[in-house]
Amino acid sequence: MIDNLQPLRGMKDLLPDDYQVHNYIINKARDVGVLYGYKQMSTPILEYTRVFNRCMGDSSDVISKEIYSFVDKSNNAIALRPEFTSGIIRSFISNGLHHKLPLKLFSTGPVFRYDRPQAGRQRQFHQLNYEYLGAKGAITDAETLKLAVDILKALEIEEDTTLELNSLGCSESRIVYQQKLVEYLNDFKDKLSGESKIRLNKNPMRILDSKSEIDQKIIANAPILSDYHTNESKKYFDELLKYLDILGIKYSINPRLVRGLDYYCHTVFEFTTQKLGSQATILAGGRYDMLSRIMGNYDVHAIGFAAGIERIALMKKYNIFVIKPVFVLPIGKNNICYALDIVDKLRLHNIISIIDPIGKIAKRIQRVLNEDAKFIIFVGDEEKMNNNLKFKDLKNQKEYIIDLEKVLELLK
């Protein structure tokens, strides 16, 4: 006997009721994406670790602390995907999809991060992911943000979220800003948290994303990135804001927003909520024009975002309409074949049907009631002989002796 039959810490079973909610969220989001021209694709859950190291940066929290990476039996370093974008870009390059640009791609599935489990944050969780490859110009940023807003509206949570927006500018802007930021932070080097002291040498902009109270006090007076934007970067961001205003999208500019991954440039954004405590981010993303060059020496303008399905499910209790099955109960073994024929014909008419031939009839009826079913069909000797059925409506407790055609009419 196995001593511990619990799932791994930070990983949960998705039971049928959970899956109904997940599928509802996925289908709603997918349908909105289809209206924008997005097509679904998937990549393997496992990739070579170098794919994520190269894309996300060694100094990112995901790579330095959270990635599930190990050596397989062929001595390859492989990893469970911690996000979708790296795998999508790898697939884009390895499948030679450059001639198909622009591409709008939707993916969904589990991702994995070794993090401290808490409400809204698990080590295995599920995401909705949208990537727009070949997305050039601020207008595509605006369209992507409109897609995100429309998805949140379809899921009935848009009013409970706030769009926080920032511009990281171009690479020239960030180089100048990073120098100024390091100069400022060096004056507080001894006061920074241990983690930020390491980041100061590797990726100082990531300190702006620190959750440490000590760091936050220091960051409060740090230089502002937008003050060092080139004219090109300023023009790009101003154009985006103009489009958002035209589209009626409300936003709040957060000059400290940098996102947690190294591949972003220009536009970065988060949709946050007050309903989930510390796990405030529901949907987030940004522009990553340099990522395809980092991976495969190709220049592809791109923007995308991901949303956490578990967090969306925590925000709203969805009243999902579930079609209840019809239960067919044969009375006596000699009527099982007739019952199987009835079930088969019901399914041919797209009616969810379950046959339950085992056990005493009272216990079988109780199982039906436990499933909150609405209808039972009894098949006994008399019904078989007369080629009809005993149909019971559990809501009004009425029984009818009718043929299959009449049953089909009642169930449609």
From Swiss-Prot:
Its EC number is 6.1.1.21. It is found in: Cytoplasm. GO terms for cellular component: cytoplasm. InterPro entries: aa-tRNA-synth_II (IPR006195), aa-tRNA-synth_II/BPL/LPL (IPR045864), Anticodon-bd (IPR004154), Anticodon-bd_dom_sf (IPR036621), His-tRNA-ligase (IPR015807), HisRS-like_core (IPR041715), HisRS/HisZ (IPR004516), HisRS_anticodon (IPR033656). Pfam families: HGTP_anticodon, tRNA-synt_His. One of its GO terms (biological process) is histidyl-tRNA aminoacylation. Keywords: Aminoacyl-tRNA synthetase, ATP-binding, Cytoplasm, Ligase, Nucleotide-binding, Protein biosynthesis. The keyword Protein biosynthesis applies. Homodimer. HAMAP family: His_tRNA_synth. Belongs to the class-II aminoacyl-tRNA synthetase family. This is Histidine--tRNA ligase. It comes from Rickettsia typhi (strain ATCC VR-144 / Wilmington). The gene is hisS.
